[in-house]
Amino acid sequence: MKKNMRRWEAVLICMALLFSLFSLHTVEAKDEETPKTIFPVHVIHKTGDDKENFVIVIMGDGYTADEQDKFLQDAKQKAQGMLRWSPYKEYSDHINIYAVQAVSNESGISVYGGKNADTYFHVKVYGKAAGFSNGGDEKAKELRQDLEQNYLDRGANVATIHVLCNSE
């Protein structure tokens, strides 16, 4: 069990690093009373204006519509864990964390040479590594832009995205 947890932590860290390579840019948010985004967005941890803080977005892959409560619980647990680690712990009062409920058609994620799940981001595990397939990276970029334009505080940007994969 511990070995699997470490593997998934490594996968998530790799995914976060992958997304941090996307160029950061500032986009003015539209004037709307009710933010409209592709998927529901939940505040996990917010300490101030998104433009002034480091914005982390947790997105799920392999969570069906019926598993969205589980995703939110997993995302909260992941965020709480991150905020206990350095450097997040020291800067927790300058970090905002959001969860985006991306809905997959099938539960779980794809495994190279094995299961081929129909998920939103098409994350596939290749041994100890994971990556996007079938345009999943473009969907992640689209969701990032959607958040920056329609949800975050005016002029804010997403600093990093963590993709939480449902392994059950």
Regions found by a protein language model. Name each.
Residues 7-8, 26, 145:
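Positively charged, low-complexity intrinsically disordered regions
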Residues 19-32:
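Sec-dependent signal peptide cleavage junction
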Residues 31-159, 164:
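Zn2+-dependent metallopeptidase catalytic core
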Residues 10-22:
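Hydrophobic helical h-region of N-terminal Sec-dependent signal peptides
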Residues 1-12:
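Bacterial N-terminal signal peptides that target proteins for export
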